[in-house]
């Protein structure tokens, strides 16, 4: 979240202290954004494919999924910050998306598709 200088960042699973406490993590995120108008947020995924541990030319794929953070949790699908991650282009939170749609749109889905495309070009 740029307004929070990149937090929660790589600590997203343990942002509120205990690893995997989605409710506490979301509560802390919303509290820290209280009074902040700029609520842009994004998820980022970086993947690397190596043929072996010393591979000098790994295949890299990255992707970001942009949205905004909303105060009220909406939806029950997904996990983590999904209920508060609002997608303006769809008019809904990522927790309202069916898994098949989320898997295509998300940062992980996009990075995976890019990696598969790069691997296919090698064949």
What are the functions of these language-model segments?
Residues 1-123:
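Anionic-ligand binding patches
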């Amino acid at each position: 979240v740029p307004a929070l200088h990149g937090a929660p960042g790589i600590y997203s699973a343990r942002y509120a202290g205990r690893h995997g406490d989605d409710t506490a993590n979301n509560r802390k995120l919303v509290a820290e954004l209280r009074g902040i108008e700029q609520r842009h947020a994004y998820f980022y995924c970086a993947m690397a494919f190596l043929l072996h541990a010393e591979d000098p030319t790994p295949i890299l794929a990255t992707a970001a999924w942009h949205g905004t953070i909303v105060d009220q949790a909406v939806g029950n699908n997904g996990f983590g910050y999904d209920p508060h991650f609002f997608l303006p282009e769809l008019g809904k939170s990522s927790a309202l998306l069916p898994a098949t749609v989320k898997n295509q749109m998300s940062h992980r889905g996009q990075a995976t598709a890019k990696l598969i495309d790069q691997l296919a070009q090698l064949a």
